């Protein structure tokens, strides 16, 4: 699945496009408002990015810590959904632990999620967040709850 900056979707490889099953349009979500873009997705790894704009900055001009957390959670959740949706399941963030190492003021924040565990009710992802120079700025450990869909 690939989400372009305008929220449209394309399926990559054998992963399903599940956008039509969401009850809220991408443009109306936090992800769409701030411009998260999924760049690549496989069942074991996914990447995404967001352009640094004033919407993402806190009052000191740095990317807000919550933006890193939200990008990591979106990426880990969407990567999980891409696999479990066809099995009648949905995925939502269960826990998000993010540590910060380096501030970002401009450019992009780029995220890479690597799947560590895929259980029947919980998936776990490690997410690295980097600046345009490839420097590690934050890491997130994401637990994703997998539950039956109610659609």
Curated annotation (Swiss-Prot):
Residue positions binding substrate: 100-102
Alphabetized GO MF terms: 1,4-dihydroxy-2-naphthoyl-CoA thioesterase activity; 4-hydroxybenzoyl-CoA thioesterase activity
Keyword Hydrolase in annotation: yes
Gene Ontology CC annotation, any one: cytosol
Active site residues per record: 73
Family: Belongs to the thioesterase PaaI family.
Protein name: 4-hydroxybenzoyl-CoA thioesterase
Organismal lineage: Bacteria, Bacillati, Actinomycetota, Actinomycetes, Micrococcales
């Amino acid at each position: 699945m690939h989400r372009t900056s305008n929220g449209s979707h394309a399926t990559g490889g054998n992963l399903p496009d599940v956008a039509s099953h969401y009850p809220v349009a991408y443009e109306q979500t936090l992800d769409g408002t701030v411009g998260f873009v999924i760049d690549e997705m496989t069942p074991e790894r996914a990447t995404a990015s967001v352009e640094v704009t004033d919407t993402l900055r806190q009052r000191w001009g740095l990317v807000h810590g919550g933006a890193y957390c939200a990008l990591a959670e979106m990426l880990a959740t969407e990567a999980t959904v891409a696999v479990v949706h066809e099995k009648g399941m949905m995925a939502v963030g269960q826990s998000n632990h993010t540590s910060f190492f380096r501030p970002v003021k401009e450019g992009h924040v780029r995220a890479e999620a690597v799947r560590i565990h895929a259980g029947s009710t919980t998936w776990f992802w490690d997410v690295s967040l980097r600046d345009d120079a490839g420097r590690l700025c934050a890491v997130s450990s994401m637990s994703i709850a997998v539950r039956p869909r109610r659609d």
